[in-house]
Design a protein with these regions (language model features):
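A conserved structural/catalytic subdomain of Rossmann-like adenosyl-cofactor enzymes
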Residues: 5, 11-252
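Conserved SAM/SAH cofactor-binding pocket of Class I
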Residues: 1
Length: 252
């Protein structure tokens, strides 16, 4: 492996013929909301990461790092993940314009909301922005996972347990709806919400406005739709559903 130390934004170390080197996979965990990242010689940007009309705020470098990651990915096949504070999902002004542009290019494949207080030096919650240039033209939307409640206390910090990580990975691999946890948000819904990607807009927290099936309460039984919503578990254990449930009457 080739390891280099330098200023990612001001003086990228991986370049070729005056342009950024590109890779199949890129992963980044940049400093959150870095201030004063923009130097006078970075506009226009010789690496074409940003333009004057799509320029991250000088006092907040979150989108500068995300744009650098996207530019470092191979065209049409590059994949990447960047850990950033939740603010990138909904902040306005220049960041709104950049977010809208990235969304309209269908680069974002998924967003994973993480618990608060899991990183040293900050207690704010973060999210993993998953970028995938492959099949972007056929992508129907963004797969959103709300994993903010999956953690354990570990001294003064929160920590992801193995089962929390497995829950995230299994949900991502299955790409199926799990109520209150994950689902595919289609482009039309994102556009309707004015390109706001705040996770709480799309994933309903447990304990708020849960719809009750009155028929099930009165006569007993479990709605068949509730059983089908657990498809991720039935795929993992194909014979389990028939052992636990049977058709009592229409829809239950």
């Amino acid at each position: 492996a080739e390891i280099k130390v330098g200023d990612t934004l001001g003086n990228p170390q991986f370049t070729q013929y005056g342009m950024l080197s590109t890779f199949d996979v890129c992963v980044a965990n940049p400093p959150f909301s870095q201030k004063n990242w923009l130097a006078s010689d970075m506009l226009p940007d010789q690496y074409n990461r940003w333009t004057a009309s799509l320029l991250p705020p000088a006092k907040c470098g979150d989108y500068a790092f995300l744009l650098h990651l996207i530019s470092s990915m191979k065209a049409d096949v590059g994949r990447g993940a960047c850990i950033l504070p939740h603010g990138v999902l909904f902040r306005g002004n220049a960041e709104y314009d950049i977010r809208k542009n990235i969304i309209e290019k269908h680069y974002i494949k998924g967003i994973i909301g993480l618990p608060p207080n899991i990183f040293f030096g900050t207690g704010i919650p973060a999210s993993i922005i998953i970028i995938d240039k492959k099949n972007k033209d056929n992508r129907k939307g963004i797969f959103v996972i709300d994993a903010k409640d999956g953690f354990t206390k570990d001294g003064a910090k929160n920590r992801l347990r193995e089962q929390d990580i497995k829950h995230i990975v299994d949900a991502w691999d299955a790409q199926q709806t799990i109520p209150h946890y994950c689902r595919l948000v289609e482009w039309s819904e994102i556009e309707k919400n004015d390109y706001n990607l705040n996770i709480s807009r799309y994933i309903q927290p447990i304990g708020t406005e849960i719809q009750h099936d009155i028929e099930a309460h009165l006569h007993g039984g479990l709605p068949a739709t509730d059983v089908e919503n657990m498809e991720i578990f039935w795929k993992a254990c194909p014979t389990l559903k028939d052992k636990l449930f049977w058709d009592a009457n229409n829809g239950y």
